[in-house]
Amino acid sequence: MSFPDITPSLKATMPDLRGRLLANQSLAELTWFRVGGPAQVLFTPADEDDLAYFLAHLASDIPVYVVGVGSNLIVRDGGIAGVVIRLAPRAFGEASASGDIVTAGAAALDKRVAEVAASANIGGLEFYFGIPGTIGGALRMNAGANGGETKDVLIEARGVGRDGTKHVFSNADMKFVYRNSGVDPSIIFTSARFRGEVKDADAIRARMAEVQSHRETAQPIREKTGGSTFKNPPGHSAWKLVDAAGCRGLRVGGAQVSEMHCNFLINTGDATAHDIETLGETVRARVKANSGIELHWEIKRIGVS
């Protein structure tokens, strides 16, 4: 599927734009599942000012989506009408530490932020070492693992609104809840500051090694997967509910529930986005029938079928 090319008209209305605009760009290679259709427009801003300029001049009726490293995302097979914004690591991927503060761009890998903190003897951010995403996604979904969450360490976040206005959000402003934040979904996060605590370097490294070991032994990290598929319902582990419903190893087309960790869906090689989403919905239905508990997607799904 392809969409009408609107990049010439966008460029005409944005003469000072410095970032890159691409029409009908495939998104499959930008997601960990390696599935999905094209973006009508893929925009990579040069920096925060360029992002703000673009949004301020973009017609309000054009939908906008953000894609990071695509680790917790399904792009549907029909692609995405409108604009997909990808914050490139070169412009938004820096991470640095000073005292007990870590500053990171929204495109910085969570794992990289943990490493920068550890190099400065800053503890408290080790949990990021086991999360395969970026800081932008961590801010949006209050990412957490291994006993830590973004809400525990965030000082403030910067972002740009749909109208191009820049914003700064305190921890309280973020209105964090389990695997979500209360900030307007149209805000595109650009950077954040975190506070840890100065600790013994060996203790920090040991904790990070534990986190990595857990990932390697308990999760299918070498597969084409989107990470944790469903949120844990209060008082329950999603994977246990999926397992109890007899879904371990269940397949739809080229998509399969992981044998190693059944809260992970994997692309066995030739899956479509439809296969993966259908499998997820099948699992949800079986869990509901077996336990009466409704699972909610943790993976974001965007685009048209």
UniProtKB/Swiss-Prot annotation:
Its EC number is 1.3.1.98. It is found in: Cytoplasm. Keywords: Cell cycle, Cell division, Cell shape, Cell wall biogenesis/degradation, Cytoplasm, FAD, Flavoprotein, NADP, Oxidoreductase, Peptidoglycan synthesis. It comes from the Bacteria. One of its GO terms (cellular component) is cytosol. It is an enzyme of class 1 (oxidoreductase). It catalyses: UDP-N-acetyl-alpha-D-muramate + NADP(+) = UDP-N-acetyl-3-O-(1-carboxyvinyl)-alpha-D-glucosamine + NADPH + H(+). Residues 34-199 form the FAD-binding PCMH-type domain. Pfam families: FAD_binding_4, MurB_C. GO terms for molecular function: FAD binding; flavin adenine dinucleotide binding; UDP-N-acetylmuramate dehydrogenase activity. The keyword Signal does not apply. GO terms for biological process: cell division; cell wall organization; peptidoglycan biosynthetic process; regulation of cell shape. Cell wall formation. Belongs to the MurB family. HAMAP family: MurB. NCBIfam families: murB (TIGR00179), PRK13905.1 (NF010480). This is UDP-N-acetylenolpyruvoylglucosamine reductase. The gene is murB.
